[in-house]
């Protein structure tokens, strides 16, 4: 059986364990997820929970979305995903909270990677560059495409769009959970830019639960860092306004 929850990537920070070890973590905001639909093998051919999180403006939701959410007595959601073979006896309209996970468990995190636009084959695919001598006629070009055949085979490694792909980071450690602030801390980095949506599920790989314990309260350090960032941005805005007034 699988546990899962939807959330939004806040950013990265560092926390200390009770043994004084410094670990990098990604902070994910996972507000209570609404169970929009419970799928069963009898009616849908498979078992799954359809979760939704972060309200969508009514004007931005079409009639089918509004009607679907209304069945669960909820507002239309911006991010909707299914958790296959979900653990727990949930009903339509119930809420899945962040405490479904605990520190020491391992999860798979799925998200859309950062987009980098059109890039060459060296940056995009890690290919080697050509000779950098003056006599060379190519340095960062893709090079030969092959001989004779006057077509490009499907799957040929060439320059193109980089990023913006659905990727899954597997077997990441849950460093801590803060139910009061709807935060989950995951060791290491996860796919996607800040404020992007992510899906957190129980890992498909075998693991042994880790006995990790953070020093202090999980939310205190994260809130303190967010407060420092906000105060810095406020000071920068005030300085900018003062400069504009002086001019």
From Swiss-Prot:
The keyword RNA-binding applies. It comes from the Bacteria. SUPFAM superfamilies: Translation proteins. Coiled coil: none annotated. InterPro entries: Ribosomal_uL3, Ribosomal_uL3_bac/org-type, Ribosomal_uL3_CS, Transl_B-barrel_sf. Keywords: Ribonucleoprotein, Ribosomal protein, RNA-binding, rRNA-binding. Pfam families: Ribosomal_L3. Residues 222-241 have a biased composition (Basic and acidic residues). GO terms for molecular function: rRNA binding; structural constituent of ribosome. One of its GO terms (cellular component) is cytosolic large ribosomal subunit. One of its GO terms (biological process) is translation. Residues 124-145, 218-247 are annotated as: Disordered. Belongs to the universal ribosomal protein uL3 family. PANTHER family: 50S RIBOSOMAL PROTEIN L3, LARGE RIBOSOMAL SUBUNIT PROTEIN UL3C. HAMAP family: Ribosomal_uL3_B. Part of the 50S ribosomal subunit. Forms a cluster with proteins L14 and L19. One of the primary rRNA binding proteins, it binds directly near the 3'-end of the 23S rRNA, where it nucleates assembly of the 50S subunit. This is Large ribosomal subunit protein uL3. It comes from Oenococcus oeni (strain ATCC BAA-331 / PSU-1).
């Amino acid at each position: 059986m699988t546990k899962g929850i939807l959330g939004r990537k806040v950013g990265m920070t560092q926390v200390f364990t009770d043994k004084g070890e410094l670990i990098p973590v990604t902070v994910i905001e996972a507000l209570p997820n609404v169970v929009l639909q419970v799928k069963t093998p009898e009616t849908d051919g498979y078992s799954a929970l359809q979760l939704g999180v972060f309200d969508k403006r009514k004007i931005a939701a079409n009639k089918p979305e509004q009607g679907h959410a209304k069945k669960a007595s909820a507002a239309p959601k911006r991010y909707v995903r299914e958790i296959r073979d979900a653990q727990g006896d949930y009903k339509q309209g119930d809420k899945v909270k962040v405490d479904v996970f605990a520190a020491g468990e391992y999860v798979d995190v799925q998200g859309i990677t950062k987009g980098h636009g059109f890039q060459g084959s060296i940056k995009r695919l890690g290919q080697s560059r050509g000779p950098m001598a003056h006599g060379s006629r190519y340095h960062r070009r893709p090079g030969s495409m092959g001989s004779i055949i006057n077509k490009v085979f499907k799957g040929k490694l060439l320059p193109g769009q980089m990023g913006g792909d659905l990727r899954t980071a597997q077997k990441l450690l849950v460093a801590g959970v803060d139910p009061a602030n709807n935060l989950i801390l995951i060791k290491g980095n996860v796919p996607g830019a800040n404020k992007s949506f992510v899906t957190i599920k129980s890992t498909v790989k075998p693991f042994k639960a880790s006995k990790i314990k953070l020093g202090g309260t999980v939310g205190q350090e994260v809130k303190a860092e967010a407060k420092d960032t906000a105060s810095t941005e406020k000071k920068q805005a005030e300085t900018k306004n003062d400069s504009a007034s002086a001019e």
